[in-house]
Regions:
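Structured, solvent-exposed acidic/aromatic patches
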Residues: 37-40, 74-129, 133-396, 418-422
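Membrane-proximal, proline-rich intrinsically disordered regions
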Residues: 20-72, 78, 99-102, 106, ...
């Protein structure tokens, strides 16, 4: 039955592709008139866009891994020069902005603007996923087009809205989405169109959609938890979540619209960093390896995840410092750091062409709860949540039981012996999202400074990594009338980090 559902999802995507007159997923010629295509055809395409925004080459996960010193470059490749230089100009990772607006958000907006009670579940899903993407865009860029952003057919120059105000509205939109799901559940007058095989995330389980909505709220509340002026607001919103009663995710949220080993149907991470459909290893795979720092850190803390996050060569784990300029002058000599000898991306990250594309890890949800419990509940449940976060990370990677790891007497591993509990939470979250959703650890670093003593690239001309991205060149060209002044990407922090 599972395979049948997956085939239906992929068939929906293929049908849409065959009917498109332009690019992949360009379903509606008029984004403000979504009724031209059925929502059950829009949804899997939109979700596939979400997957690609996270996992494709130069997507959110790539950016996070390079900013957070998880990934480096093998000898023989010149893959990540701009990243190692921290050359965050208007062309740097421009697609992280353009791709989401023109693809994922466009399609989710087609769902969220459907009219009629029969579409209640689809409208709610559209709004939840819009909040998911807008949240990441704010965390990356600060002020962004929001209230007018998805009306570009009639307004090609949308205004930029205040980042904190967007955050507040996103939380409200998520609350409204949960309310709409409940109202649709209880509507005995109109028969609702129920998502099923077309939903590549939860297969139409609307309780899970409510948990996901709460977890996106949780992420945003955690991000603001260092702001004294937002304490009352955070407490109020936590009470709203508790009263609603659905809780948070306890398993990883991932897109799987039927990924398989066929051409153009592989999981986007596997396709970019694993193997092509003929079984040939990709250049990205060979070019990308662990840093020396992260391998040393994992080794020194007796962390068994090392063999799952990174591939272990027959000669043992080996990493490369970011920005190394002359590989042959290292103590290993000529060819000492070629792909066959360094630790590339591991089997817990690259599982198969069929794996789901992770949007939000269960580990992060537990760590976010632990942080808020520490700050707003005197840490009454923080230890249990922290240890659940570590176990969720082990589970995703296939690394087994985590108890022996988190009970060893090591700082930032064992909750009881860690002197700085917040540092322990953020450090463990950094490890848990490594290779999976690493951009979240970059956001955490920008607001907390943890993990401490994280190296910077040897090619960097600044004392620290960027704290945001510059607005893309596409906005400079098309929306210059509303575009704010380009920020200093090293000092102009996002509002929650100030």
């Amino acid at each position: 039955m599972k395979n049948i559902l997956i085939s239906i999802k992929m068939m929906a995507v293929v049908l849409l592709l065959s009917s498109c007159s332009d690019s992949f997923g360009d379903i509606n010629t008029d984004p403000n008139n979504p009724s031209t295509v059925s929502p059950n055809l829009i949804l899997p395409v939109a979700q596939n866009y979400s997957a690609f925004s996270q996992e494709r080459n130069r997507g959110n996960n790539t950016l996070g891994n390079l900013m957070m010193y998880n990934w480096s470059q093998s000898d023989g490749f010149s893959w990540y020069t701009d990243e190692f230089l921290y050359l965050a100009t208007s062309s740097f990772y421009q697609q992280n902005f353009d791709y989401v607006y023109s693809n994922a958000l466009k399609q989710y907006n087609s769902l969220s603007t459907l009219e009629g009670a029969q579409y209640g579940y689809y409208v709610a899903i559209g709004n939840i996923m819009k909040a998911y993407h807008f949240n990441i865009l704010v965390d990356t860029y600060g002020d962004i087009p929001y209230s007018e952003a998805l009306k570009r057919g009639g307004d090609p120059t949308p205004k930029y809205d205040n980042a904190q105000e967007i955050y507040t509205d996103l939380v409200a939109q998520l609350t409204a989405a949960i309310t709409l799901i409940d109202a649709t559940d209880s509507n005995t007058t109109t028969k609702a169109l129920v998502p099923g095989a077309d939903d590549g995330i939860f297969e139409g389980d609307m309780m899970m959609w409510k948990k996901f909505a709460n977890s996106i709220k949780l992420r945003m509340l955690t991000r603001q938890s260092g702001m004294a002026a937002r304490a009352a607001y955070i407490n109020t919103q936590l009470a709203v979540i508790a009263a609603e009663g659905s809780g948070y995710i306890t398993s990883d949220v991932a897109v799987n619209i039927g990924y398989n080993a066929s051409t153009n149907q592989q999981n986007p991470k596997w396709d970019a960093f694993g193997y092509d459909v003929s079984g040939t290893v990709t250049n990205n795979n060979q070019a990308t390896c662990a840093t020396d720092y992260i391998l040393t850190y994992l080794t020194n803390t007796n962390d068994p995840r090392i063999d799952f996050i990174y591939e272990k060569p027959s000669t043992g784990h080996l990493g490369v410092m970011q920005g190394l300029q002359n590989y042959d002058e290292t103590p290993l000599g000529v060819d000492g750091l070629v792909p066959a000898k360094v630790s590339n991306i591991g089997p817990g990250i690259l599982k198969s062409a069929k794996q789901g594309a992770v949007l939000y890890t269960a580990a992060e949800a537990y760590f976010n709860q632990a942080e808020l419990d520490l700050k707003f509940n005197a840490g009454a449940n923080a230890k249990a949540l922290y240890e659940s976060g570590i176990q969720a990370s082990f589970t995703y990677l296939g690394a087994g039981n985590a108890t022996a790891y988190f009970t060893q007497a090591k700082d930032l591993v064992n909750w009881n012996t860690s002197t700085n509990k917040l540092q322990a939470i953020i450090t463990q979250k950094w490890l848990a999202v490594n290779g999976i959703d690493a951009i979240q650890s970059w956001f955490d670093y920008n607001r907390t400074g943890f993990p401490k003593n994280l190296p910077i690239s040897a090619l960097a001309s600044t004392p620290d990594r960027p704290v945001r991205l510059a607005y893309p060149a596409s906005e400079v060209t098309s929306n210059g009338i509303n575009l704010p002044a380009q920020p200093n990407v090293f000092t102009a922090k996002i509002f929650w980090a100030n």
